[in-house]
């Protein structure tokens, strides 16, 4: 993390001076440099810039923060989102982010950026997740004096993920919708956006036509005298809202009913009342109104129904009472409609999966202090007090209490705990503000003044409650400052009641949607249950929220508003300093500097990081405490200075130490995963090439004469480097992204029978088609200097159009590609066997047929007959007119010895006799001494063994001339003693095939072909063990070289060389003749070639470096059994190269395979 003085520090824990002024100054420096994000440990501080900052939220920036640790890049909301997402996946724990701050501080924008990041890194989130914000903002946001798009409700958004980290669902919980905004707005503010969107679209969309007028016509909209918002097109916003509702799943009928209800609320607000002169009221407009009776009269029931006498009275209301009823109905309609919309969104998103991981984002409008603060402000500020209490509990109080409980040395730091203020509002015993208000509301004569009197009487000396000089006000000292509340309307708003006659309207409507908003309408007449108050509902919902947040790993964003004017580049020192103080940033910095950045229980720490330490990764027998200590000691952390051990947890002081530990774990896990991946890929490739080889050769055996080179040629798919040839890919076009199965050069002979030249073609076989591409000279005089040739696609043949492939029964390379309904192609391809094998592997329906006469279909429908004749002088195929002369080849029964990959049980790896893919690519690269590669005669069953390559040979003369290798049996090398190793650590076997030993034990090494797991013997017990747990014990050198005929000694001080080719002198690597049992690399080593190694291993050099590593078969008693790995002779008729694998130990593996994916791998080398 970069720390600079010019633009402040990234993490305020690093401030040299710790004070509120220093924090304020650092934020100001960073704000001036457009660095709006700053850390306090893991807490992110965000200052609203009120402008767009270049490159702050680009796609490139998002990618930069993906998968990075927090300290690697400057502070950003993306870094917090990435940490939250990765922690959820790595720890399998639910996460949440609590975004707090004043209105206009940028809380909603921060939540959007977190959602944007999670959507980008976790894959497609679905259309519902994408459009939900459009609906929520339309119905829940409004323009305020401080914010043009202020959320007027609190929401907790939960995103559900599967174990892979892909989003699968979500849920929204809403809190404290500002219902009063429906009926009243202060000057300069607007009602909810949806009202203005509907009115703006009325002229263009038929679904918005409900006899609507302009906004200034409606009483519920004209009080704020503001109808538009800069930068907001209400007509386009309505279009987006309409489309979003369709995506969510709202039917056309539902949408119509919702917008009809929005219209009804507007017209309901225009209903005005006048005094009727009789103590009641009447509607000023004489036009009929359906709710007239409900608004003008109150239905009062005396007595208890069902218990004796009761009376029902219809009492007229005065204009004020009628207006109150009108507004109460309007607020109830909008509030219930909003809840319905939230529920429909949840129905479309939520999945009921207890295994799903969740990430929650809490965005709730911030602390409010207005000129006149009423019941709504009290509720909002109470919620913010509770959120501040959560922050204190989890970051300040709980941290210090945990140090004490764990026995960690710690000096307590004082901080303001706002629990006393929360108790003042919500406590039941002694009764707090909400409880007192509920008590007053339960009495018929309860009034606002009575509530104030009882409140001040209950807390005459409370430190956070005081009276004012005004008889209708009181003061609460919140954490964010002192707020004066006016009690006017407290009781009515707390009752939050709709009179029964208003609820009864739902039974009179023909709209099922309207009736569904009031499910209690049918029971209202008989229900005896006392309705809950608004205060009770707020306490209940916020306590549920607190419980939900407490189950998650919390993350925090503290949003700060730099000025009251929403102006860019304006930083109000006093305003920001006030927020710094009440947010408790100073205490947060002090505790963070003195505390520990990371703490975790011993068991979780051990199981997460044991992979980084060889002692703990494989076979740890100690307890979790000592295991955690071993891990930290291994990475070089010192006890006391960098970490401390608590009673149940480990504590690490610096976050950089944790990041380093996490990086080391990532590298180690990647290394092991890479080994497993290589093994699986290698196994898959071996199986694939076996099937291709077998399929191609089976299609030709007994049907076509063979060429020796064709039998021994390795398969490697791409012979033209297609994958790196981007110009060729461009020529093929959009098909260049298909998987390439085969690519090679070939000759196209369609016109050669008329004297034309043979056309050279590039053949590319993909998973869908065959492409034939010509290489033509560039005729552009200027361009050809840079691009002398061009690729031209001549033909694309889809697999499903290939009718058949015809070959002759002779040894030539010609093949006729017959295409259904089109002209055919006569091609000459040297690697026809591989091509046919690939075709049959991916398209088994292709017919392979053989004939000595080809009927070639030319372009234009003409045909031509091509005949193949046997001619000793014909070679691989000489074309003359329409005749092709071919020399005799190997018998049609000739076939290579192809052995299938063998699969061992017990979790061991596959072992194969054929060469690996790498060996195939290396192909016929020579190099061998003493006659080169050992090759035997033909294999049994008529299989033809590959012939030697130039410079190589087996026992017997080389067909390319040169001196034959010495005849006669080779001299036997002296057998070395058994190889031994000393145990460095204790190892306890967890599987039946493993060998247990203690530190210092001497193990006889039997097989160390697997670099990670060796096979050994101890006290008569045989098994495998981690190679890194032992060190080899040097053993005595082998006897001096025997008689001449072996490799030439190296010059003094020089490296041991290779034996001379064909057995002659020279610094070549010695290879003996073939061992009994068949062809393969080496057999018994020449005399003096060095002693043999362990079974299946490499031979050891002779003393003084006189001989190279011999790869001959070990002498009797020293080497492995025939076919037992390197040095041993391969099975009869085996492939060239390394010998076949020897028998693997139980649960182990043979030489040449990779480490099997055991339940636990051996420890990595030190320093990994």
Curated annotation (Swiss-Prot):
Bias (Gly residues) ranges: 924-939, 950-959, 1063-1083, 1090-1099, 1120-1141
Binding residues for ATP: 101-108
Coiled coil location: none
Domain TH1 span(s) in chain numbering: 704-892
PROSITE patterns according to UniProt: MYOSIN_MOTOR, SH3, TH1
Top-level taxonomic group: Eukaryota
Molecular functions per Gene Ontology: actin filament binding; ATP binding; microfilament motor activity
Domain SH3: 976-1035
Keywords: Actin-binding, ATP-binding, Motor protein, Myosin, Nucleotide-binding, Phosphoprotein, SH3 domain
Region of interest called Disordered, as start-end residue ranges on this chain: 876-909, 921-978, 1036-1168
Residue numbers of Phosphoserine PTMs: 311
Disulfide-bond pairs as recorded: none
Residue ranges, compositional bias (Pro residues): 1040-1052
Bias (Low complexity) ranges: 960-978, 1100-1112, 1152-1161
Subunit structure, as described in the record: Myosin I heavy chain is single-headed. Dimer of a heavy and a light chain. Inability to self-assemble into filaments.
Entry remark concerning the domains of this protein: Myosin tail domain binds directly to anionic phospholipid membranes; myosins I could therefore move actin relative to membranes and vice versa. TH.2 and SH3 bind tightly to F-actin; this together with the nucleotide-sensitive site in the head, allows single molecules of myosin I to cross-link actin filaments.
Protein family: Belongs to the TRAFAC class myosin-kinesin ATPase superfamily. Myosin family.
Functional description taken from the UniProt entry: Myosin is a protein that binds to F-actin and has ATPase activity that is activated by F-actin.
Note: This organism expresses at least three isoforms of myosin I heavy-chain, encoded by genes MIA, MIB, and MIC.
The protein's name: Myosin IC heavy chain
Biological source species: Acanthamoeba castellanii (Amoeba)
Lineage start: Eukaryota, Amoebozoa, Discosea, Longamoebia, Centramoebida
Gene: MIC
């Amino acid at each position: 993390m970069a720390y600079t003085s010019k633009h402040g520090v990234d993490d305020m824990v690093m401030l040299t001076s710790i004070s509120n002024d220093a924090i304020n100054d650092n934020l100001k420096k960073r704000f001036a440099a457009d660095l709006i994000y700053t850390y306090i440990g893991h807490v992110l501080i965000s200052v609203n810039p009120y402008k767009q900052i270049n490159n702050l939220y680009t796609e490139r920036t998002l990618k930069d923060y993906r998968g990075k640790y927090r300290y690697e890049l400057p502070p950003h909301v993306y870094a917090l989102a990435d940490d939250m997402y990765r922690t959820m996946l790595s720890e399998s724990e639910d996460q949440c982010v609590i975004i707090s701050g004043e209105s206009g501080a940028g809380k909603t924008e921060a939540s959007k950026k977190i959602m944007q990041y999670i959507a980008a890194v976790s894959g497609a989130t679905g259309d519902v997740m994408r459009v939900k914000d459009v609906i929520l903002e339309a119905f829940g946001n409004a323009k305020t004096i401080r914010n043009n798009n202020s959320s007027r409700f609190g929401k907790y958004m939960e995103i559900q993920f599967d174990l892979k980290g892909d989003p699968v669902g979500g849920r929204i919980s809403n809190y404290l919708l500002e219902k009063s905004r429906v009926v009243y707005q202060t000057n300069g503010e607007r009602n909810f956006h949806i009202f203005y969107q509907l009115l703006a679209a009325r002229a263009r969309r038929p679904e918005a036509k409900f006899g609507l007028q302009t906004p200034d016509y409606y009483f519920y909209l004209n009080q704020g005298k503001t109808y538009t918002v800069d930068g907001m097109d209400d007509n386009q916003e309505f279009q987006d809202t309409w489309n979003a509702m369709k995506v969510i799943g709202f039917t056309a009928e539902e949408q119509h009913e919702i917008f009809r209800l929005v219209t009804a609320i507007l017209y309901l607000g225009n209903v005005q009342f006048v005094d009727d002169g009789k103590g009641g009221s009447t509607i000023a407009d004489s036009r009929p109104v359906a709710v007239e009776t409900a608004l003008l009269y109150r239905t009062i029931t005396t007595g208890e129904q069902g218990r004796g006498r009761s009376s029902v009275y219809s009492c007229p209301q005065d204009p004020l009472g009628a207006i109150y009823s009108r507004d109460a109905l309007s607020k109830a309609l909008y509030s219930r409609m909003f809840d319905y919309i939230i529920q429909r969104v949840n129905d479309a998103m939520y999945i009921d999966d207890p295994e799903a991981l969740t990430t929650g984002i809490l965005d709730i409008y911030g602390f409010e202090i207005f000129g006149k603060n009423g019941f709504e402000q009290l509720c909002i500020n109470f919620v913010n007090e509770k959120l501040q209490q959560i922050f204190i509990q989890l970051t300040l109080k709980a941290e210090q209490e945990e140090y004490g409980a764990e026995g960690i040395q710690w000096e307590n730091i004082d901080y303001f705990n706002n629990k006393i203020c929360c108790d003042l509002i919500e406590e039941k015993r002694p009764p707090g503000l909400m409880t007192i208000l509920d008590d007053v509301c339960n009495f018929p004569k309860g009034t606002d003044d009575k509530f104030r009197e009882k409140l001040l009487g209950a807390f005459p000396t409370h430190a956070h409650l005081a009276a004012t000089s005004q008889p209708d006000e009181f003061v609460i000292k919140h954490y964010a400052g002192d707020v004066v509340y006016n009690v006017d309307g407290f009781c009515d708003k707390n009752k939050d009641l709709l009179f029964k006659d208003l609820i009864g309207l739902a039974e009179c409507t023909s709209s099922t949607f309207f009736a569904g908003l009031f499910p209690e309408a049918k029971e209202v007449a008989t229900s005896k249950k006392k309705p809950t108050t608004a205060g009770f509902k707020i306490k209940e919902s916020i306590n549920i929220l607190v419980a939900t947040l407490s189950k998650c790993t919390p993350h925090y964003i503290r949003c700060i508003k730099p000025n009251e004017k929403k102006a860019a580049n304006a930083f109000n020192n006093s305003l920001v300093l006030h927020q710094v103080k009440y947010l408790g940033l100073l205490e947060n910095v002090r505790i963070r500097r003195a505390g520990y950045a990371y703490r975790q229980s011993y068991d979780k720490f051990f199981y997460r990081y044991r992979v980084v330490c060889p002692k703990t990764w494989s076979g740890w027998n100690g307890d979790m405490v000592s295991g955690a200590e071993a891990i930290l000691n291994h990475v070089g952390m010192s006890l006391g200075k960098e970490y401390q051990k608590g009673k149940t947890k480990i504590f690490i002081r610096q976050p950089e130490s944790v990041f380093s530990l996490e990086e080391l774990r990532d590298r180690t896990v990647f290394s092991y995963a890479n080994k497993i991946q290589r093994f699986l890929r290698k196994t898959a490739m071996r199986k694939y090439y076996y099937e291709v080889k077998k399929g191609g050769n089976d299609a030709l055996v007994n049907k076509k004469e063979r060429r020796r080179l064709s039998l021994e040629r390795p398969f490697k798919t791409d012979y033209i480097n297609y994958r790196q040839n981007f110009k060729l890919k461009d020529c093929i076009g959009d098909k260049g992204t298909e998987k390439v199965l085969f690519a090679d050069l070939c000759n196209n002979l369609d016109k050669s029978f008329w004297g034309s030249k043979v056309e050279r073609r590039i053949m590319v076989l993909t998973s869908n088609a065959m492409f034939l591409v010509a290489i033509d000279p560039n005729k552009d005089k200027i361009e050809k200097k840079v691009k002398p040739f061009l690729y031209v696609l001549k033909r694309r043949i889809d697999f499903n159009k290939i009718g058949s492939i015809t070959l002759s029964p002779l040894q030539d390379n010609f093949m006729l590609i017959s295409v259904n309904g089109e002209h055919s192609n006569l091609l000459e391809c040297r690697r026809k066997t591989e091509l046919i094998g690939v075709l049959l592997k991916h398209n088994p329906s292709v017919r392979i047929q053989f004939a000595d006469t080809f009927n070639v279909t030319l372009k234009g429908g003409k045909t031509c007959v091509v005949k193949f004749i046997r001619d000793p002088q014909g070679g691989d195929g000489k074309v003359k007119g329409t005749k092709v002369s071919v020399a005799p080849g190997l018998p049609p029964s000739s076939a290579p010895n192809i052995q299938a990959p063998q699969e061992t049980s017990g979790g061991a790896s596959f072992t194969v006799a054929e060469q690996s893919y790498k060996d195939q690519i290396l192909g016929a690269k020579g190099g061998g001494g003493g006659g080169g590669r050992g090759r035997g005669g033909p294999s049994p069953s008529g299989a033809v063994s590959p012939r030697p390559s130039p410079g190589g040979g087996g026992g017997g003369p080389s067909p390319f001339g040169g001196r034959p290798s010495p005849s006669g049996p080779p001299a036997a090398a002296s057998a070395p003693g058994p190889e031994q190793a000393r145990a460095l650590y204790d190892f306890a076997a967890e599987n039946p095939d493993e060998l247990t030993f203690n530190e210092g034990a001497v193990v006889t090494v039997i097989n160390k072909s697997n670099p990670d797991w060796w096979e050994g013997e101890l006290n008569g017990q045989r098994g495998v063990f981690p190679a890194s747990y032992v060190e080899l014990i040097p053993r005595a050198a082998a006897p001096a070289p025997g008689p001449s005929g072996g490799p030439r000694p190296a010059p003094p001080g020089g490296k041991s060389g290779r034996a001379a080719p064909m057995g002659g002198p020279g610094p070549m690597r010695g290879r003996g003749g073939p061992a009994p049992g068949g062809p393969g690399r080496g057999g018994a080593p020449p005399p003096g070639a060095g002693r043999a190694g362990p079974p299946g291993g490499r031979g050891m050099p002779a003393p003084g470096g006189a001989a190279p590593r011999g790869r001959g078969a070990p002498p009797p008693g020293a080497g492995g059994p025939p076919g037992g790995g390197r040095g041993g002779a391969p099975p009869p008729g085996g492939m060239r190269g390394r010998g076949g694998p020897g028998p693997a130990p139980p649960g182990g593996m043979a030489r040449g395979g990779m480490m099997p994916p055991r339940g636990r791998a051996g420890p990595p080398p030190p320093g990994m």
